[in-house]
Structure formats: C-alpha cells, structure tokens
Amino acid sequence: MSEAATATLAVPVNERDHVMGPANAPVIVVNYGDYQCPGCQQRHRSTEKMARELLDSVRLVHRHFPLVKSHPHALRAAEAAEAAASQGKFWEMHRLLFLRPDKLRDRDLRGYAKEIRLDLETFDREMASGIYADRILKDFYFSLNHGITGTPTTFINGVRYAQSGVELVATVKAIVEEQVAKRLQ
C-alpha cells in the first residue's frame, strides 16, 4: 500500500455533500474535483469502476474545486451539477460532465439537463440566477485554506492520498479488505 500524506480531511462528510453508497460503508472516499481537469476525468473513471466493484463497501463523496483561472467552464459546470442535484440527479449530471469535458458551455449544460430529463424551466432559472456559484466558491476558498491546492485531491477515511487512479482503487480495495476483516473478528 502506498504511503499516505499527513493531511487529513478538514470537513467531515455532511448533509451538503454529494454522496453515493451506504452510510455504514467501511470506506469513505472524498474526491475534490474540477470538471475540466484531465486528472479528475481519469480519477472519475477509476472511482466509477471502483463504485461498481465495491458497491456495498464504499461511500463516494464529490466536492467541487473549480480551478477557474485555468478552467473557464469549471464553475458553470459545477453550478449545473448543483442544479441537477436540486432535482435529485447530481450523479447523472456529474457523469456527463466528466464524459464530455470539452463541451461545458451553457448550451451544452442545458442539453445535458434535457438529456437527464431535468425540469428545464427550473434548471434555466437556477443557472441564470447563479444561486449555486457563491456556495461553490466559498467551499473552494475554505478548502484552499485547509490544504487543498489542486485537483484531483482524494481522501480515504479522512486521510489524503496522492496516487494515480489505478493505485487509488488498489488502496481502497486493500482498506475495504482490512475493514471487513476487522468487522469479522
């Protein structure tokens, strides 16, 4: 198992987070990501595969960390994900945004909203109002002040890991096996 960095997760998983997986999962993976970040796209593919393989043992959490200076569409994409979340479809939008990182202009985001069958009137109103931008940016600056400096950044059970997607999946599998063994003792 690769050595973990000493950094720990500043904010525990809470009701504001986007979560997939059982509440009692022995392993919690928190990803900080940006929809235009190539590394995040690779990490998304790895964690999506991991979620399918370890469905009952892992809880996935996504937190926005849009690097707006280098990724001009990342904030709007995060807003679209939040607008989808308000209609119960965060993960559907999240997946599309990572699958199509070169198509994140407003017209593209609206097309994705239509594709996942969001109420377009509500989506359009929320996107026009910018109601999610302030929260996303506040979370970004809070995270920045607590040691998150780039993407992708991943924490497993509260400890920061700096690994490639493949290595990360192997680490999570090892931690799941370790946690399951502890429960059986």
Regions found by a protein language model. Give the residues of each.
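N-terminal targeting signals for export/organelle localization
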Residues: 1-10, 185
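Residue-level signal for pocket-adjacent positions within structured domains
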Residues: 8, 13-15, 122, 156
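A short beta-strand-turn-helix
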Residues: 10-27, 52
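Short secondary-structure boundary/capping elements
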Residues: 11-12, 42, 135
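Short clusters of hydrophobic/aromatic residues that line enzyme substrate/ligand-binding pockets
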Residues: 19-20, 104, 161
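Residues immediately within or flanking Cys/His clusters that coordinate Zn2+
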Residues: 26, 34, 151
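Structural alpha/beta surface segment adjacent to cysteine/selenocysteine redox centers
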Residues: 30-114, 119, 175, 179-185
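C-terminal cap of thioredoxin/glutaredoxin-like
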Residues: 45-49, 111-185
